[in-house]
């Protein structure tokens, strides 16, 4: 008989993406994917990123040509998906967009030239911010447990209005420090 082969384990990021995806699919979302090599139009212009925004600089973005780059966020998939949905008259839309992103960052404890991002997008009529909050709170509690607390803070993202960031209590210590 041959030598026993040790089977590897799934990477922690892959496990997390699978878990997040499963939670959102359970809430009626579908997965949207797109290319990692993108156009300036989809990565910046269509997302209302100002022409002078620092993220467009050569020092922050990996440009392949003047108009082609490695995506800096998964948001270009939103543009592609929304354009397709409008063309096909396929609304409302509920998607989750997991994927790799690239930025010209110096590696440290909080930065990496390649990182993973997951975005959530809902497009439809009569959708309220309260429904968004409820969706995100449901997600957080399913991921970290029912006792997890959330706090929504207003934030400015050029491509969403209104915008918010979400703080989550520590799943390990419950916020005790």
In which residue ranges do the predicted regions lie?
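Conserved oxyanion/phosphate-binding beta-strand-loop segments in alpha/beta enzyme cores
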Residues: 1
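TRNA-recognition modules of translation machinery and tRNA-sensing kinases, especially anticodon-binding
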Residues: 4-177
């Amino acid at each position: 008989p041959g030598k026993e082969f040790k089977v590897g384990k799934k990477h922690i990021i892959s496990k997390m993406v699978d878990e997040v995806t499963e939670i959102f699919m359970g809430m009626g979302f579908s997965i949207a994917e797109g290319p990692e090599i993108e156009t300036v139009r989809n990565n910046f212009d269509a997302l209302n990123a100002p022409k002078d925004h620092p993220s467009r600089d050569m020092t922050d973005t990996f440009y392949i040509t003047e108009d082609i780059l490695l995506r800096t966020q998964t948001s270009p998939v939103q543009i592609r998906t929304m354009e397709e949905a409008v063309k096909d008259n396929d609304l409302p839309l509920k998607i989750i967009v997991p994927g790799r992103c690239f930025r010209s960052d110096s590696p440290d404890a909080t930065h990496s030239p390649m990182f993973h991002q997951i975005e959530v997008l809902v497009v439809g009529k009569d959708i309220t911010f309260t429904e968004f909050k409820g969706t995100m709170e449901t997600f957080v509690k399913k991921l970290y447990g029912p006792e997890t607390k959330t706090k929504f803070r207003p934030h400015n993202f050029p491509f969403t209005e209104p915008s918010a960031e979400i703080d989550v209590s520590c799943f390990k210590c419950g916020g005790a420090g």
